[in-house]
Design a protein with these regions (language model features):
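Short internal beta-strands
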Residues: 79-83, 202-207, 225-234
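C-terminal helical cap/extension that packs against the catalytic core
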Residues: 214-270
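Nucleotide phosphate-binding/pyrophosphate-handling subdomain across enzymes
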Residues: 112-226
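Flexible active-site lid/hinge loop adjacent to a nucleotide/diphosphate
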Residues: 10, 19-113, 281-283, 287
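Short glycine-rich anion-binding loops that position phosphate/pyrophosphate groups of nucleotides
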Residues: 31-33, 52-53, 84-85, 181, ...
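Residue-level signal for inorganic ion chemistry
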Residues: 9, 28, 48, 64, ...
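Walker A (P-loop) phosphate-binding motif
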Residues: 1-9
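Glycine/aspartate-rich loop-and-adjacent alpha/beta segment that forms the canonical ThDP
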Residues: 277-301
Length: 301
């Protein structure tokens, strides 16, 4: 049996595990932590995406991107869906290895949000590498491997605040995606909401600290899928200015008032989605407190 721990930016500091015997450490590392590290030297490096974020800290997207790419540059084996080489290294493209059709046919993943399916593909790619390269186990039937792995993973309890589908109240579905702290995450959340319900209207609650994201470069046309957007927080004016070309926008004093208005306008079959696209620190301690507040409001309904 192997000792495996998931640590790092998910809430368990790496330094707390220095004295523990761990065979495999799965470390989620942020751009802040990479920037402060002299070297990474991981066996497997997984880069899920590079989308504009934390520009208030890193000053430009190019600097932010160069920091994130160190995950691939300083690892022995790389997993990514980027379409180019970095520092002369080839990447293992998990998108090509596990094509969409193999996932769509699995009923266990039918209601998974899009970004979770991407994450699962990367996870399975890493698992396949570990089993074949480190454990000397040859996986002859990829479909069989996939079915067994998905069966196990689908039984896991999902983490809160990540496209968390809450109870259906009076025919309205409430979704807590407070972990969406940039616009690219919110775009994926809107797509996942449409997959969840093909017919109903989607009412979006968003806002907070934009962290100097440049909304000009975003695929904001997807906001046409939104019936109405309720915006609160520090940068609500800038967000409204960008999104009002695509959907109706309403400025709100805070999350509570945004929720109240969204609840009032929504009808049976609709979705009320909290996917802020911003940091929470202008009004909350973190995304967890923001998500818990939203869940409280839904529970009172």
């Amino acid at each position: 049996d192997k000792s495996i721990s998931a640590i790092g930016n998910i809430g368990k500091p790496v330094l707390d595990f220095l004295d523990q015997k761990i065979d495999i450490a799965i470390i989620e590392i942020s751009s802040f932590q990479i920037e402060a590290s002299s070297r990474l030297e991981s066996e497997i490096g997984i880069l899920l995406n590079i989308e504009e974020d934390h520009i208030d800290r890193h000053k430009s997207f190019e600097i932010y991107k160069s920091i994130k790419l160190r995950i691939l540059q300083e690892s022995n084996f790389n997993i990514s869906k980027l379409e180019h080489k970095i520092a002369g290294k080839e990447f293992y493209d998990y998108e090509n290895y596990f094509p969409e059709s193999r996932f769509l046919n699995n009923p266990a993943l039918k209601e998974w949000p899009i970004h979770d399916v991407f994450n699962l593909k990367a996870c399975l790619s890493a698992l396949k590498f570990i089993l074949e390269d480190k454990e000397n186990l040859q996986i002859l039937d990829v479909n069989d491997f996939l079915d067994k792995a998905i069966g196990i993973i689908a039984s896991f309890e999902k983490l809160p605040h990540r496209f968390e589908v809450l109870e259906n109240v009076n025919g309205i579905t409430y979704v807590n995606d407070s972990k969406a702290t940039n616009f690219d995450a919110t775009l994926k959340s809107i797509e996942s909401s449409r997959n969840l319900n093909k017919q109903g209207n989607i009412y979006l609650i968003c806002g907070g600290d934009l962290k100097e994201q440049n909304l000009e470069n975003k695929n904001a046309a997807i906001f046409k899928d939104i019936k109405k957007c309720f915006i609160y927080g520090k940068d609500k004016g800038s967000i409204k200015e960008s999104l009002s070309h695509f959907t109706n926008c309403v400025l709100c004093a805070d999350l509570d008032s945004a929720y109240s208005l969204a609840k009032k306008e929504s009808q049976i079959g609709d979705i009320v989605l909290l996917s802020p696209a911003c940091s929470s620190t202008d009004m909350f301690e973190d995304y967890r407190e923001r998500g818990l507040r939203f869940k409280e409001l839904v529970k009172r309904s």
